[in-house]
């Protein structure tokens, strides 16, 4: 672990660059959740509820 730390220090990585990279990565995760995961979850819940209602109403006929 110490070797990796020394390598990063020797490569002149600054804390500001690392911080900006981490903020960008977290922002990407949030954007992915908003654009992909949440709409897909809402769609699957909607479809499963609709299917449940269709099966219930079909069974009563």
UniProtKB/Swiss-Prot annotation:
It comes from the Bacteria. Keywords: Membrane, Photosynthesis, Photosystem II, Thylakoid, Transmembrane, Transmembrane helix. It is a single-pass membrane protein. It is found in: Cellular thylakoid membrane. Its main location: membrane. InterPro entries: PSII_PsbX (IPR009518), PSII_PsbX_type_2_subfam (IPR023428). GO terms for biological process: photosynthesis. The chain crosses the membrane at residues 26-46. Pfam families: PsbX. One of its GO terms (cellular component) is plasma membrane-derived thylakoid membrane. Belongs to the PsbX family. Type 2 subfamily. PSII consists of a core antenna complex that captures photons, and an electron transfer chain that converts photonic excitation into a charge separation. PSII forms dimeric complexes. Involved in the binding and/or turnover of quinones at the Q(B) site of Photosystem II. This is Photosystem II reaction center X protein. The lineage of its organism: Bacteria, Bacillati, Cyanobacteriota, Cyanophyceae, Synechococcales. The gene is psbX.
């Amino acid at each position: 672990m110490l070797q990796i730390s020394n390598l990063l220090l020797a490569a002149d990585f600054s804390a500001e660059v690392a911080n900006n990279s981490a903020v960008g990565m977290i922002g990407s995760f949030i954007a992915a959740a908003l654009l992909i995961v949440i709409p897909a979850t809402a769609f699957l819940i909607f479809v499963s509820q609709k299917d449940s209602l269709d099966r219930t109403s079909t069974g009563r006929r």
